[in-house]
Amino acid sequence: MAHNLTGGQKDTGGAVINSEWVPVKTKALIVGEDLDTADSLGNNANADKIASPDNIKFSEKMRTLFIGEDSGNHVNNFLWAYNVDTKKLSRILSTPTGAECTGLHAVDEINGWTYIMSNFQHPGEFIKTASSDVKKLETLIKQNYNLSLIHI
């Protein structure tokens, strides 16, 4: 959500709020797109747009909002970077099937370097509930990468 903030506002009782950071208008900053039917990989939301944001971190230096997903709407959850100046949304990380992005942290300055850190938890959880989708994914993985999934 994006908020317009201002001072000089009053609460519902008419008392002045002692802050210059009072939200006076709110709108959706980034929205995803649900699909009417799942795509060929089993995604219930457009994989090129955000779904179920869960963890966020803002980097003032990069002017970027980092957003981790925890969604049953994407087969693989993603970590996104949204530049607040250009309004560009970029997918920068994909977790294993069923895992969620967590532990998100952006460090603006350590010895001249900037770091974006993230990890994931409970990989494979999706596999237990969506075996037909996993079989489709496994076929595509074998075709494209000559690999196979680890079955739990």
Spans of features found by a protein language model:
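Hydrophobic/aromatic beta-strand positions that recur at structurally equivalent sites within the blades
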Residues: 2-3, 82
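Surface-exposed loop and turn segments in beta-propeller and other repeat-based domains
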Residues: 13-48, 93-97
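Loop/turn-rich, solvent-exposed surfaces of beta-rich toroidal or solenoidal domains
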Residues: 43-86
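Residue-level detector of Asp-centered blade-edge/turn motifs that repeat once per structural unit
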Residues: 60-61, 108-112
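Conserved beta-propeller blade signature
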Residues: 64-68, 113-118
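Short glycine/acidic-enriched loop and turn motifs that connect beta-strands
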Residues: 72-73, 123-125
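Conserved blade-ending motifs and adjacent loop-strand segments that build the rim/top face
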Residues: 88-107
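Conserved small/polar residues in nucleotide/adenosyl-binding loops
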Residues: 150-152
